[in-house]
Amino acid sequence: MPKVGVEQSLTAISEELRGMGYDVVQLKQEQDAQGCDCCVITGQDQNVMGIQNAVTQGAVINASGLTAEEVCQQVDQRLRQQ
């Protein structure tokens, strides 16, 4: 199953993705994003973690303003495109 990194504060999204069968990893620092097929961030510190500096080869989804369901749909779509 694809590995999805999710920022710590996005608990509802983590739980929903786990329910969909994804391997969810909590993003606490830059290295946590390595090996992830997709990362979900809050958008508050969009590049503080360095995720958009090509730490991960996967998609980066900004969860700002989206519901957990909307974010999970985006994760699903992006991972199917890869």
UniProtKB/Swiss-Prot annotation:
A Pfam family hit: UPF0180
Organism: Halalkalibacterium halodurans (strain ATCC BAA-125 / DSM 18197 / FERM 7344 / JCM 9153 / C-125) (Bacillus halodurans)
Cross-referenced HAMAP family: UPF0180
NCBIfam families membership: PRK03094.1
Superkingdom to which the source organism belongs: Bacteria
Homology family: Belongs to the UPF0180 family.
Protein name per Swiss-Prot or TrEMBL: UPF0180 protein BH2667
